[in-house]
Each structure stands twice: as C-alpha cells, then as structure tokens.
C-alpha cells in the first residue's frame, strides 16, 4: 500500500515517521512548502501540493491537519478513490461526519479515525476484562485525565482529548449511553 500524509505538524511528523519505517510512505504535503520539503528530504519521499495529492498513485491518504480542514480533505480523498485515515476529530459536526461515512461506503473505501488509544495494551486488557464479565455489568464510567501533555494554543483542548476518552468509553460500553452527566 502506498500512503501520502497531509499535514506535517507535531502529530503529522509522527505519522510520517511511522509510515516511512513501514516502507509505505510515498508523498508528504504541508501548507508550509519548506516544511514539506524538509520532511520529504529527511524520509526520501516526494512532496506535492494539496490539490495534486488526490491525483497521485497512492492507495491511501493520511490527514493530520487542523480539525477544521478534515472534512474537505477527507471528502476530496474519498472522491478520488483513496482510502482515508484522518486524525480525530473526523469532522466538526455530525452532518459532515455522516456525509463522510456515507461517501466511504458508496466509494467502497476505508475511512478510519485515529483513535489510537483503542489499540493501547492497557485499554485492550480492560476491554477484555469488561467483555468477559470480570467487572459485571457496567453501570457508570468516570474518566479523568492525569497527563494533559503539551499544551498547544492552536487547538481547543476539547478537540485534543475528549475524542479519545469518548471513543474508549464507547468501546467499553459497547453501546451508546442513555445519559451523560
């Protein structure tokens, strides 16, 4: 599989590194051309402008841009017959998220959101215990962040952390909650 990464900021660089190590990275793209070129040189891959990324021979596009850009880039990628991995959040509202899900189904392409904590070994163990009934029937889940990491002014803390917590809670519950307080 050939991959292009769009967005070479803080988290995008991590994704670039991982796909490069897997040998699947073919293109990088960033709104700052000099950043894209430096990262492209570092990983020995080509760079291209956003408008051209959809015409490349890649199989999938990884989106690590600011959240406000996710919908339009993901939509264009799906319309170009590319599989899409988009960092959270998928979109800024339910209507856009549902439109992307419908488009991915129509195009028969994978649309995946980067809820990486779903694959963390500690979460997988907890999920196994819950699934096996080791905690009985879940009645209540409380979530508290112990490590907020690096504070970034360019994004809202709600968009940074809440999607991870919500995805894990839904993964444990296996259903949509009846109430949230």
Give the residues covered by each predicted segment:
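Beta-loop-alpha module in the N-terminal Rossmann-like domain of NAD(P)-dependent dehydrogenases
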Residues: 45-101
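A contiguous active-site-proximal alpha/beta segment in oxidoreductase catalytic domains
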Residues: 91-153, 165
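Conserved acidic residues
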Residues: 26, 59, 139
